Each structure stands twice: as structure tokens, then as C-alpha cells.
């Protein structure tokens, strides 16, 4: 098997318990892999700034790793605290999505391109929306009488499915959409994905996709799991992910990530 030089980890449902921190079993294997010279990065749909504490917990700042946030729309240098690569939804696309959400009575949450603000068309605090776990910045309430001036790294729409009128209309706008098992859709700029983020990092660090291991559980992990050298699905993955993975590990709650790092990195090198 090709030597693994980089491990890309999804966060929620993979390295981290759902909407929580890194599972305890995964911490030391991630650190040890980096000590052996293997690059380890998070590739997540989460926003960047509120997720950095988890990266720092496993010394990704010390080992000067990158962080793929918003499904690949923003790549962040954890050590220097700078954005090194980005691609956003345009202001016209963001305005269109809010108009569409109003038409079809959908809740929409958009992360703006300054990393500290979100635009919403509902009250997430009053509704105790689960996305609050990832954001502690400023909320801007959508006003249909005004034109939104912000670009967006990622928009989230709740309670949808593949044949939803909102999704059908949105897919005609040259955007990327991934819908998870809970019916939440993540919307990004065209050709944005975790795989696209890994391809950019590949060009910067001279690490081929065939030399990467990627672990994930949801549809926004599909393309990176399918295209890297060793794509691994969690036992708690959606079935479409298990179908294209080269291996299925155990669940997030049983340290499935740790088991794969130990098998392919820690126990495979003398």
C-alpha cells in the first residue's frame, strides 16, 4: 500500500462526538501521527474560528497544519491565523437563496465571508438551533427590503430533501448542495468540496491524493473518501458513504478514527 502522508478527518460524527469535542480516544493517536511526520488536518463543514480550539487540542498549531472549513470554501493556516485560500457564494447567490427560502418557508443560515457574522431569516437562539454550537459571533436578521452585501462561505437550509422544491430551484443556480441524513442541506460555491480543498493542499504540500487517508460519515465527505488513496467510512455513516469507502471503521463513540490511525500509521511504521 502507498505510504500515507496526510490524514484528513471530518469532525462531527467522525473525530468528534456529534456537536461536541474530539472523542478522547482520538486525541493521542492524532498527536502521535503528527510526531511521526504525517500531516493531519480537519476537513469539516464547521466554521473556522469556533473550531480552532479542537485543532489546538491535538497540536495542529504546533505542527503547522491547515484547517479546511465550510466544506472547503475556506482554508485556514492554524499557526499564522490567516486565510490561505477561499471561494465564496456571491452576493447575488446569497440574495437569491434568501428569496427562495422566503418563497418556500425555509429556515436559512448563511456564514458571511468575514468569519464573525451570520445572516439568518429566523431566531436561532429562541429555537435553540444546533448550529449555535459552532458559532458565537454576530447575528444579522435578513430583511427582504434590503439587498445583502455580504458574500458567504456556506449557507445551511433546514428540513429539506432531494425532491424539495427549494432544493430543485437552488440546484439550477450553479452551486454545490450536500444533504445529510437529518434533512439539513449545506450550500457552497460551485466546485467547492472537501476534495477540492484537499486538491489545493496537495499542490501546496506536494502530497498526492493517493498518499492521503480520509475518514468521514456524511454526504459532504463523499468525494474525498472516494478519491483519496484510502477512503474510510465510520460505522455511523450514511449508507452512500459506506458503499464507496475502501474500509468501514467503528463508530465515533468507540474511537473509530483512533483505530484507523493505529492500524495504518502507528502500527505500520518502525
Regions found by a protein language model. Name each.
Residues 2-6, 23, 185-270:
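Mg2+-dependent phosphoryl-transfer enzymes with acidic/Ser/Thr/Gly-rich catalytic loops
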Residues 3-19:
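Asp-based phosphoryl-transfer active-site loop
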Residues 24-125:
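Active-site phosphate-binding/coordination module
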Residues 31-34, 102, 171, 226, ...:
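Anion (oxyanion) recognition and catalysis
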Residues 37-41, 63-65, 153-155, 210-212, ...:
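Short active-site oxyanion
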Residues 39, 107, 176, 230-231, ...:
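Residue-level detector of anion-binding/catalytic polar loops
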Residues 63, 71, 170-174, 227-228, ...:
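Short, structured coil segments at secondary-structure junctions
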Residues 100-215, 219-221:
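Conserved acidic, metal-coordinating active-site core of Asp-based
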Amino acid at each position: 500500500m502507498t505510504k500515507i502522508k496526510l490524514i484528513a478527518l471530518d469532525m462531527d460524527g467522525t473525530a468528534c462526538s456529534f456537536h461536541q469535542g474530539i472523542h478522547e480516544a482520538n486525541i493521542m493517536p492524532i498527536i502521535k501521527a503528527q510526531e511521526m511526520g504525517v500531516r493531519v488536518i480537519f476537513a469539516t463543514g464547521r466554521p473556522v474560528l469556533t473550531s480552532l480550539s479542537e485543532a489546538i487540542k491535538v497540536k495542529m498549531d504546533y505542527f503547522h497544519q491547515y484547517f479546511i472549513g465550510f466544506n472547503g470554501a475556506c482554508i485556514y493556516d492554524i499557526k499564522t491565523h490567516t486565510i490561505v485560500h477561499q471561494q465564496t457564494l456571491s452576493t447575488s447567490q446569497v440574495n437569491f437563496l434568501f428569496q427562495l427560502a422566503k418563497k418556500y418557508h425555509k429556515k436559512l443560515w448563511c456564514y458571511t465571508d468575514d468569519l464573525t457574522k451570520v445572516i439568518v431569516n429566523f431566531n436561532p437562539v429562541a429555537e435553540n438551533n444546533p448550529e449555535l454550537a459552532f458559532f458565537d459571533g454576530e447575528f444579522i436578521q435578513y430583511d427582504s427590503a434590503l439587498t445583502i452585501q455580504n458574500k458567504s462561505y456556506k449557507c445551511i437550509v433546514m428540513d429539506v430533501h432531494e425532491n424539495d422544491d427549494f432544493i430543485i430551484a437552488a440546484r439550477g443556480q450553479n452551486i454545490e448542495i450536500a444533504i445529510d441524513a437529518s434533512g439539513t442541506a449545506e450550500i457552497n460555491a460551485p466546485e467547492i468540496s472537501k476534495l477540492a480543498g484537499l486538491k489545493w493542499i496537495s499542490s501546496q504540500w506536494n502530497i498526492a491524493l493517493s498518499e492521503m487517508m480520509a475518514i468521514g460519515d456524511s454526504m459532504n465527505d463523499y468525494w474525498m473518501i472516494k478519491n483519496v488513496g484510502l477512503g474510510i467510512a465510520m460505522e455511523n455513516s450514511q449508507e452512500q458513504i459506506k458503499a464507496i469507502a475502501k474500509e468501514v471503521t467503528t463508530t465515533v463513540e468507540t474511537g473509530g478514527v483512533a483505530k484507523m490511525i493505529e492500524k495504518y500509521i502507528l502500527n505500520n511504521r518502525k
